[in-house]
Each structure stands twice: as structure tokens, then as C-alpha cells.
């Protein structure tokens, strides 16, 4: 059973994007009756809004290039801080995303919730630890989704500096230092 899902939510209208699913014909035959129970009718006005906005493949690709130009400095701010402050200590791991809107950060196991609690105390609000897991339950308490798209670069630099400090403090507490 393989299902692939995608959405235009961050590309077009946050929280109002169009979603798509790709799967085999057998999986689709199983899933359609389940979806039909949940969906009375699709938001055709929203679909039309997307067709008019995205227009065609070339226009959509050009739009994504404009998004990349806006987001690139924000992602660099996050990744540069992680590379400088966290990488030498070996207390976290992350991948350099190729596209997308998030950096998935894996803290030392057992420290993600504490690190984010410290961030909140310092005035930095982030998506909850383990938010990418089903029901928000990360059995390792390590995953933090960093979403650098909203704040201006200057605010983001301040926030990621606080984040790095809080990750360090949570790791020290976990190690009993």
C-alpha cells in the first residue's frame, strides 16, 4: 500500500490549498468509498481560484522560483545558525531541505519538549515538539519542525539564536551537567 499526498497549501493560500493523492488503482478502489462518506462536495470556487492563480505549469514554476527567492535567506539564517551553534556539539541533526517550507530538526532524544518550553519562556513560539508524528506523539521526544517562512530575516536570526541556546540548555539538563 503506497499513497503519496501533496498540497498547494503553502504555495497558494495557507490553510486553503488543494490537495492531491497518487496511488495504485487497487488502493484508489479501496479509498474512494471511504472518502465519499467524508466529502459531500468539493469547494469548486476554491478549485477555480487555484486554476486562475496557477494558470499552467510554466507559471506555477515561475511562482515557485519567486517563493524560493523570498525563502532562501530565511533558510540560510536557520541552517547557518544550526551549523555554527549545534553541529560542533553533536546534540542535534537536520537535513538541508531541497525545497519545501520546513527544516526538520532532531534534538537529543528526550529533549525536544523541554527545548521548546525554554524557547517559549524566552518569548519564541514554535510548532509543538513531535507535531509531524501521528497525534503529535514522538516516542523519542526529539523532532522539532522549524518553519522559517513567516518572520522577517532579522527576527528569525534572533529566534534561531534563542532556539540554539535552548537546545543546548535542554541537552545539558538531560546529560545532568
Mark where each language-model region is.
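Conserved core segment of the aminotransferase class I/II
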Residues: 1-68, 72, 172
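Short, conserved active-site loop motifs that form the nucleotide-linked donor/cofactor pocket
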Residues: 2, 92, 124
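Short beta-strand segments
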Residues: 6, 20-22, 96, 102-106, ...
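Short, solvent-exposed loop/turn elements at beta->coil junctions and helix N-caps
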Residues: 7-9, 91-92, 130-135
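Conserved C-terminal alpha-helix-loop-beta "cap" of PLP-dependent enzymes
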Residues: 28, 32, 102-145, 153
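A common structural junction motif
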Residues: 39-40, 121-127, 164-172
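Conserved glycine-rich beta-strand-loop-beta hairpin in the small C-terminal domain of fold type I
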Residues: 65-79, 91-106
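PLP-dependent enzyme catalytic core of the Aspartate aminotransferase-like
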Residues: 137-177
Amino acid at each position: 500500500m503506497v499513497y503519496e499526498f501533496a498540497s498547494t497549501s503553502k504555495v497558494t493560500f495557507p490553510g486553503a490549498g488543494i490537495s492531491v493523492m497518487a496511488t495504485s488503482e487497487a488502493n484508489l478502489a479501496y479509498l474512494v468509498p471511504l472518502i465519499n462518506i467524508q466529502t459531500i462536495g468539493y469547494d469548486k470556487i476554491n478549485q477555480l481560484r487555484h486554476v486562475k492563480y496557477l494558470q499552467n505549469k510554466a507559471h506555477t514554476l515561475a511562482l515557485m522560483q519567486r517563493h524560493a527567492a523570498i525563502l532562501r535567506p530565511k533558510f540560510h539564517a536557520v541552517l547557518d545558525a544550526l551549523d555554527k551553534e549545534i553541529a560542533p556539539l553533536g546534540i542535534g541533526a537536520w537535513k538541508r531541505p531541497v525545497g519545501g517550507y520546513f527544516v526538520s530538526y532532531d534534538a537529543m532524544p528526550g529533549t525536544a519538549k523541554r527545548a521548546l518550553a525554554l524557547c517559549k519562556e524566552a518569548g519564541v513560539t514554535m510548532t509543538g515538539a513531535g507535531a509531524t508524528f501521528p497525534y503529535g506523539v514522538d516516542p523519542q521526544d526529539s523532532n522539532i519542525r522549524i518553519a522559517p517562512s513567516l518572520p522577517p530575516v532579522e527576527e528569525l536570526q534572533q529566534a534561531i539564536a534563542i532556539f540554539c541556546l535552548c537546545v543546548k540548555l535542554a541537552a545539558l539538563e538531560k546529560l545532568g551537567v
